[in-house]
């Protein structure tokens, strides 16, 4: 399965393409799509849309994974990030890709094993997991991290959380990290 990971941003959007075969992950490509900071917002969103569409055509992924928007201290920044993310999702869906969404916490836990990992730690682990000769830039590393997150079960924690009410009704509980009943 070929997975395209996206780290959305209005100035710089990272992308990363990996291939999953069994338990092995293989690096295919990564990079960034940059918009002109002097252009108006619609032009910048079109640049992002066109770039995502081109990456999708070039690498022919089977699915895409994208980082969810976090609520920033500055509401204007959050709105702009949401618009960039929307343009990216439109580019992916326009290519016919199923799109999966993950939080930064899910990405960090999947890649580093620690939800408060910093960008440098994510870059280092992405480099090691994909056996890259050098570290990708932070935006590309985050995009590769989202792809790795999806490849390694994606929203397993969310699925388990959805099962929790049924398990509690059946008398099951978690003790020392194990499900007991």
From Swiss-Prot:
GO terms for molecular function: crossover junction DNA endonuclease activity; DNA binding; magnesium ion binding. Binds 2 Mg(2+) ion per subunit. Its main location: cytoplasm. GO terms for biological process: DNA recombination; DNA repair. Its EC number is 3.1.21.10. Mg(2+) 1 binds at residues 7, 139. Homodimer which binds Holliday junction (HJ) DNA. The HJ becomes 2-fold symmetrical on binding to RuvC with unstacked arms; it has a different conformation from HJ DNA in complex with RuvA. In the full resolvosome a probable DNA-RuvA(4)-RuvB(12)-RuvC(2) complex forms which resolves the HJ. The RuvA-RuvB-RuvC complex processes Holliday junction (HJ) DNA during genetic recombination and DNA repair. Endonuclease that resolves HJ intermediates. Cleaves cruciform DNA by making single-stranded nicks across the HJ at symmetrical positions within the homologous arms, yielding a 5'-phosphate and a 3'-hydroxyl group; requires a central core of homology in the junction. The consensus cleavage sequence is 5'-(A/T)TT(C/G)-3'. Cleavage occurs on the 3'-side of the TT dinucleotide at the point of strand exchange. PANTHER family: CROSSOVER JUNCTION ENDODEOXYRIBONUCLEASE RUVC (PTHR30194:SF3). NCBIfam families: ruvC (TIGR00228). This is Crossover junction endodeoxyribonuclease RuvC. It comes from Cupriavidus taiwanensis (strain DSM 17343 / BCRC 17206 / CCUG 44338 / CIP 107171 / LMG 19424 / R1). The gene is ruvC.
